[in-house]
Amino acid sequence: MNDSVEIALQCGADGVHVGQSDIKGRDIRAIIGPDKILGISAGTVEQAVAAEQAGADYIGVGAVFPTSTKKDAKPMETELLRRISNSVSIPVVAIGGINAGNILKLSGSGVDGVAVVSAIFGAEDPGKAAAELRELSAQMVAAHE
C-alpha cells in the first residue's frame, strides 16, 4: 500500500511504502508493528541510512529513468544509485521509467529489484510484460552478485 498507513492497516495489507514527506519511519514502524513490511523512499545516501535506522525493510529509490507517472521526478544518476545501495544492508528497489528496454542498464548498480508501473499496466499483454521484466530483473541482479 503506497503512502496510507491507515488504509494499509484497515485492508490487511502486508505493508506500506512511504515517501520522505510522509510521517517518520520510526513512527510508522510503531504504528504498523514489527510484522508488516515497511518501505521508505530515499533520494540520498543520508535518507537511505536514516530509513534503515528507522526500521525500513527496504528502500525505494528513483526515479531512475524519465517516467510518466511522476512528471516532476528528475532521473537519478547511476552512481548515486550505487552509493545508496552500498550504504545500507537492506534491499534497495529502483523505480521510475523502468521497462524491458532499459532495465539491464541498472546492472552493476547494486539494486536488489525493481518496481514497475507503466511498462506493465500500459502493455498490450500485461502478463507477458510482467514475465519478461521478471526475467530481465533476475539477469540484472545476477550481474552484480
Predicted regions located by residue number:
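Structural loop-to-beta junction motif characteristic of Rossmann-like glycosyltransferase folds
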Residues: 13-15, 90, 111
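Amphipathic, non-transmembrane alpha-helical secondary structure
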Residues: 5-10, 25-26, 45-53, 78, ...
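Small-residue (primarily alanine) positions within well-ordered alpha-helices
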Residues: 48-51, 56, 94, 111, ...
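Alpha-helix-loop-beta-strand connector modules within alpha/beta enzyme cores
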Residues: 1, 20-43, 72-100, 133-144
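Short beta-strand segments at enzyme active-site cores
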Residues: 1-2, 59-61, 94, 116
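Conserved SAM-binding loop
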Residues: 1, 17, 40, 113, ...
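Glycine/Thr-rich beta-alpha phosphate-binding loop at enzyme active sites
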Residues: 10-18, 37, 41-86
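Glycine-rich phosphate-binding active-site loops on the catalytic face of alpha/beta enzymes
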Residues: 20-30, 60-72, 100-136
